[in-house]
UniProtKB/Swiss-Prot annotation:
The gene is Znf879. The lineage of its organism: Eukaryota, Metazoa, Chordata, Craniata, Vertebrata. It is found in: Nucleus. A zinc finger (C2H2-type) spans 204-226, 232-254, 260-282, 288-310, 316-338, 344-366, 372-394, 400-422, 428-450, 456-478, 484-506, 512-534, 540-562. Belongs to the krueppel C2H2-type zinc-finger protein family. This is Zinc finger protein 879. It comes from the Eukaryota. Residues 14-85 form the KRAB domain. It comes from Mus musculus. May be involved in transcriptional regulation. One of its GO terms (biological process) is regulation of DNA-templated transcription. Its main location: nucleus.
Length: 563
């Protein structure tokens, strides 16, 4: 059964954390098979006790496994806490039910089960004082074992509670005294005798953090956590580890070995920690809670990563550009921007991506899947981000504001493009003529000047244009539509740019200045024509006589002399 080491005079409850035995993984590997069966025996003994009381419950899956196997599923972790946490999580829900509490109370063993679940402290006086307790097999067992343990020498002032058929699985944690007293490193359970630990042996203490070990070899291994020394290297990827057992686990990454199987769905894992985390998907258990926002997680690593949202910590820094990230996986994905690596390839079209999430999103192009629905208009989208942006057309939300002029946008990309008006940045350059543009769409339209491509046709007259906006402007000639009206003189225009130029007549504004002579103009085209006076450029040539002119209007006037 379960044990408790506690000075006899102390009556306060002590939790399992105070009395747990823990071994390093390497220490666990030194135990013989008979000693390892301690896990199995503790679990099965407590199960049998509940069954003997007549409490009805279906046999847990783990019990059926333990009845058939000698090894407890968590032996690789090397932690005896696994025994307790295993059977506590198994039995506590059973004995905590109201109907079962009554059975336990009627059988006068409620105190016993409260004790083994770490809820109360049990001593001989408490057991003796209850009428009829001596006839109870559980209480009688506790009393006889306590008396028997007193006869064992070398453990003065220490009370033990033990099932005679079970070796003692728990002891008081080294260096922790009950009741807040000084550390008592000499208080050991009989378990340590059985495992070959001598009470008089000198313990090995780390002079950096104070942690205590039974073997000098274990202390040496532990100290590598302080020095950063990593003696064990993987021949496959050269990754190094401080312990041989850690290297052995890592090698499964290369071999593909997955010895830990989920009994619910059959999925296999390389590490016990991965299996335990996975099993929480089936149970729904999320034991790790964020103290800031209350959000819960299946694994401690997920909680740790989440907490960086609150702290703002970004420990993973890119050596190329200095950008920092809160998660290692984000840094790895970011690195691919610099290396150009795209390891995730679409089996349908061969297109490659930097992350598996982007490949998953891309797959929807082929499947046509659009799982994100707008609850206002019913429109569907392939991506959640696209739905979010779309919903702003209904709400009118424009969360991205320009700090220069205050103009707001519904998309961050639109704000980024807009800011180039203020910065003058033109990152998109034409490979043909070197002309630069602020927006990629403008560069694509410009390319059509070189290719001659005019994909947009007027349905009225068939005239072709290089851009969609150009054909829309042209159509207003056929419709007579002039939606842009001057507020000063009521003159109307079919283009907004024509109205802006016209309004400069009223305002007198001449924003285009000649850098040579300082002369100002209302239109950029007028400035370009004027600049030819200084450069001597004459691009308009008469085909009849070869004479050249700086303006097309001058050429037109000259050509009249030939007719």
């Amino acid at each position: 059964m379960t044990t408790r080491l506690l000075p006899a005079q102390v009556q306060e409850p002590v939790t399992f954390r105070d009395v747990a035995v823990s071994f390093s993984q390497d220490e666990w590997l030194h135990l013989d098979p008979a000693q390892r069966t301690l896990y199995r025996e503790v679990m099965l003994e407590n199960y049998s006790n509940l069954v003997s009381l007549g409490i009805l419950f279906s046999k847990p899956k783990v019990i059926a496994q333990l009845e058939q196997a000698e090894d407890f599923p968590m032996v690789e972790s090397g932690m005896f806490q696994g025994v307790y946490l295993g059977w506590k999580s198994l039995f506590e829900p059973i004995v905590s039910k109201e109907e079962n509490k009554k059975v336990l109370k009627n059988q006068r063993v409620d105190k016993f089960f409260n004790f083994i679940l770490g809820k109360t402290c049990v001593n001989e006086e408490q057991l003796e004082e209850q009428p009829g307790n001596k006839k109870n097999p559980f209480s009688e067992m506790l009393l006889s074992v306590r008396r028997g343990c007193r006869q064992e020498r070398g453990f003065p002032g220490v009370g033990l509670v033990r099932n005679p058929g079970i070796k003692l699985p728990f002891r008081r944690k080294p260096g922790v005294a009950a009741g807040g007293g000084k550390p008592h490193l000499q208080q050991y359970s009989v378990l340590f005798k059985q495992l070959g630990f001598n009470r008089a042996r000198q313990l090995c203490k780390c002079n950096i953090c104070g942690k205590v070990f039974f073997h000098s070899s274990s202390l040496s291994k532990h100290q590598r956590t302080h020095t950063g020394e990593k003696l064990y290297k993987c021949q496959g990827c050269r990754k190094a580890f401080s312990q041989r057992s850690s290297l052995a686990q890592h090698l499964r990454v290369h071999t593909g070995e997955k010895p830990y199987l989920c009994s619910d769905c059959g999925k296999a894992f390389s590490f016990t920690t991965s299996l335990i985390g996975h099993q929480r998907m089936h149970t729904g258990e999320r034991p790790y809670e964020c103290k800031e926002c209350g959000k819960t997680f299946k694994g401690s690593s997920s909680l740790h990563n989440h907490q960086r949202i609150h702290t703002g910590e970004k420990p993973y820094k890119c050596n190329e550009c200095g950008r920092a990230f809160s998660q290692c996986s984000s840094l790895i994905q970011h690195h691919r921007i610099h290396t150009g690596e795209k390891p995730y390839e679409c089996s349908q079209c061969g297109k490659a991506f930097t992350s598996i999430s982007r490949l998953s999103r891309h797959h929807r192009v082929h499947t046509g899947e659009k799982p994100f629905h707008c609850n206002v208009c019913g429109k569907v989208f392939s991506y959640h981000s696209a739905l979010t942006i779309h919903q702003r057309t209904h709400t009118g939300e424009k969360p991205y504001a320009c700090k220069e002029c205050g103009k707001a946008f519904s998309q961050s990309s639109a704000l980024t493009q807009h800011q180039r008006i203020h910065t003058g940045e033109k990152p998109y350059k034409c490979a043909e003529c070197g002309k630069a543009f602020s927006w990629l769409s403008r560069l694509n339209i410009h390319h059509r000047i070189h290719t001659g491509e005019k994909p947009y046709h007027c349905k009225e007259c068939g005239k072709a244009f290089s851009s969609h906006s150009a054909v829309n402007t042209h159509r207003k000639i056929h419709t007579g539509e002039k939606p842009y009206k001057c507020s000063d003189c009521e003159k109307a225009f079919n283009q907004s740019s024509a109205l802006i130029q016209h309004q400069r007549i009223h305002t007198g504004e001449k924003p285009f200045n000649c850098k040579v002579c300082g002369k100002a103009f209302r239109q950029s085209s007028s400035l370009m024509t004027h600049m030819r006076i200084h450069t001597g450029e004459r691009p308009y040539r008469c085909e009849a006589c070869g004479k050249a002119f700086s303006q097309s209007s001058s050429l037109a006037n000259h050509q009249k002399t030939h007719y």
